[in-house]
């Protein structure tokens, strides 16, 4: 596990790639559906417009954590953040992306994301790693929350490039952080140990997050 500064640097790089990925999209591309499937299969998948809204929410949670430092017992870490009842959480996350982009245009979203990403990175770099604040489900340390945002950036970055038919843009460092968190998550949710055919970190991230062909291992995917 690297230092907090290493993780912040990795997050900064991943978010920069995501921001650039959204810049310059045509109107048709903004309306491109992602491959994500809502829990309610009667609803449409997010387009890249709603995906951008989700990025603003999920990364912006870091800003909220830093804005409300608190004392008390930490309730989650970088891996356990992703343990939740999908039937309860997924519909809320799905709907909130639509709420986030309401009143905005696709052309505005790159600047919206740039502002949120900059606040996140600047704050994470300037505040103590052991700062505790609201981590959505429970209080979390800043360093643990930042690591969980790398997962968000890498996995949803795959959603962006997959929808556009582009090669993945995530860095080896970002993929390594994400893969390690998924390894930990696998051990906590079921039985530790990746399937032997998923030694490659990017292949593991795709299978563990459901961003690829369905894997026959019944333990997967770990996150949706």
Region roles according to the model:
Residues 1-17, 24, 31-44, 67-79, ...:
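Structured surface interface patches that mediate subunit assembly and partner/cofactor docking
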Residues 21, 58, 62, 123:
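Short alpha-helical functional segments enriched in proximate histidine and acidic residues
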Residues 23-30, 89-93:
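Short alpha-helical hairpin
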Residues 49-92:
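Conserved alpha-helical segments that form or flank metal/cofactor-binding pockets of metalloenzymes
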Residues 87-111:
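Long amphipathic alpha-helical segments that form oligomerization/scaffold cores
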